């Protein structure tokens, strides 16, 4: 059996019942991870503005920039794999902190690189480091929080990440006008703060593997339930990422200005910030597989309805629909992966989950843009079909997921 040190229970809280049901009862180490993630997201400025930096400051063509960003995406896939292995072998805390510090160093080096070959190499290096913390963070949360509270905890982390990212977009746009070097320094600084905070405030939680227990990535790939769940994530990610690539192109195609896209996406952030804390505790009491299926189906419906949108308000309405699905998906998807994973393999399971999203980021945007060029409705039909198929898959996997959830001992 894998041995995992039990985390001490949090002290009694005097929060009002409404707040206690939503944020109470979670260990202090979780809140340190939450705070570090929030600070890190407050400074997430380099990745969203990287295309602007490469074309506007370093003078790369649009085609060359696309190829460089593809290298970044490939690096991210490798990053998730390596981060998952290190989280299980070296430790969650060390991997998260090391990943954050390495990302900070890569960002500063990239910010001052001028020669194109060096620039391209450093973008790939940044891709290799930037997501290494994710599997460790997911495994750390699963170690710290018991199965009954994981849905709520993952939901709160999702909320913090989205709130921080929304603020970062505003700050990043402002700072970029003063000089792009500010973005690299602020992003690097928040990475360092996150890494140091986790190192000082969060204990190492990695369990020790018994000799006869499986312990490699191949063992994860032999887990059919986990692989099936990750395929659901891949389909969802393919569709969800159309919001940042194909959706703005579709809105421009019908004559809408960039401000209309900004308004629609602002509704996404506002919806998450308002709705997630209200329903997080309730979602924790629901069957995870059914919530996942519902979330994926609602996302498919929202993107499918985009085929009929022709005004700013119509596009905003479709965003509101799939935002609800995004909230449902985010609340349970990571919890399902954590429930499926043996404690000593949680990093690798989280790495496989992250690799699915990274692969979706490589496949989704070019496929969506290509289909939009053929027919304005075609990418949205594909989105609806993919999400419908994935939702059916999540329901089919439900009985196996429930059996595993009952069988695994935390």
Predicted regions and their residues:
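Helix-loop boundary and gating motifs at the non-cytosolic
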Residues: 24-73, 227-264
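Juxtamembrane intracellular "pre-TM" segments in multi-pass secondary transporters
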Residues: 6-27, 203-232, 410
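Helix-to-loop junctions at the C-terminal end of transmembrane segments
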Residues: 79-91, 275-288, 372
